[in-house]
From Swiss-Prot:
Originating species: Desulfitobacterium hafniense (strain Y51)
HAMAP family per UniProt: LarC
Domain of life: Bacteria
Annotated function: Involved in the biosynthesis of a nickel-pincer cofactor ((SCS)Ni(II) pincer complex). Binds Ni(2+), and functions in nickel delivery to pyridinium-3,5-bisthiocarboxylic acid mononucleotide (P2TMN), to form the mature cofactor. Is thus probably required for the activation of nickel-pincer cofactor-dependent enzymes.
Name listed for the protein in its UniProt record: Pyridinium-3,5-bisthiocarboxylic acid mononucleotide nickel insertion protein
Record InterPro entries: Ni_insertion (IPR002822)
EC code(s) of this entry: 4.99.1.12
Amino acid sequence: MKAAYLDCFSGISGDMLLGALVDAGLDFNLLQRDLAGLDLDEYELYEQKVLKQGIRGTQIHVHALEGHVHRHLSDIQAIIGRSALPPQVKEKSLEIFTRLGKAEAKIHGTDIEQIHFHEVGAVDAIVDIVGAVIGFWRLGIEKVFASPIHVGKGFVKAAHGLLPVPAPATLELLTGVPIYAQDVEGELATPPGAAIVTAYCREFGPFPKIRVERVGYGAGVKDLTIPNLLRLTVGELADEDKGQEGIREGEALTLEVNIDDMNPECYDYLFEKLFQAGAMDVYIQTIQMKKNRPAVLLTVQTPYHKLEEMRRILFQETTTIGLRVYPIKKYMLPYELLTVETNYGSAKVKVAFMEGRACTVSPEYEDCRRLARLTGEPLKQIYEEIKEKAKILLYSTKYPMD
């Protein structure tokens, strides 16, 4: 499972989170293209590499072409609702703005529909929040953890005058979240940052056990006595004990295409491109279409954030003029790859677990084929020996076979 850890040693804000996502690998041009779906032309977006206490980070700037446009929650809901953003991005963005609205309404003692957003309703906050949701979606992050949040101290100037730090709306949003303040003056955690982190994160504490793949630093505007950075670590969640881990549940998309007029020789290249682009599975089935024409049903399973690329490949590399897309639920056993040594050489074996026991042992085909070609021995013989060696290895560990 792809996970992220937010290290909030200098607080969290929407622009810092967006900068951290870009620094961790979110394509900035793709982000701009996605945000264009909001149909807002009152801002310019650019990135800048900066140093904070000697640490390089990415700073995101949202330059408003007009003054602050104050909006009600219903205005923001309308902008997001009519946008060209993916449904899951719309849903999460609306959830975050609703959280903000409820917090502001409680602080001001009024109804959420009467709340008149100030900075939160400005274009920079909209871009920061929707951009962060796009970033988590594009990077395929399924679970988010965070450290206790450094909120700062003192007072901050707002539309209503001087407010204590953390601002009342921020503190309301962080109810139940571990926070702290040290000798750093100023507002470190903002309402948009608090709304985003509490919408995604349910666990606040030390670093989880994660196989690190990417690290990004998002820079704040101010120069502080500590590095004004938000650190984002992205990687695969490493379970304490794969043998005890439960069945994983996930979501994906299925793309289907009916094809009756394509050269069958092209499918090999098509499969290769789809898998290289990140498809989870690709297969074809023989079907009978109208006028009794033989055809194939091409099916592609993909993560949500790969939809655009899969769609482009299918339209580019096949003869279809249309495709079907629908969401699916996936249930998967946890597994790990073992390396076993045989008389023929080393090979990898995929071992799946259920309720603390190894239940499936599958030698990797490519390794078996390589050893068969290398030794001249029958493929099936090599396959069986590798499988037996893997079982012996499992018997000698804490993962017995069923």
